[in-house]
Amino acid sequence: MKFVSMKSRGGDYLVVAENVAWLRTHENGQTQVGIVGSTPNLVAGTIEETAATILAG
């Protein structure tokens, strides 16, 4: 299981990379991260930056 650290304006998340289902652009330069079996997390950064963070793990 690989955890990825994601920055958020309200606090940081440790997300299991394998549980990321989708990414969606949100307002103010943020991205929604869809999590399998959960509600989406709102993280700081563009969709490209978020994808790169997940892939770099």
Predicted feature residues:
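Acidic, Ser/Thr- and proline-rich intrinsically disordered linker/docking segments
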Residues: 1-57
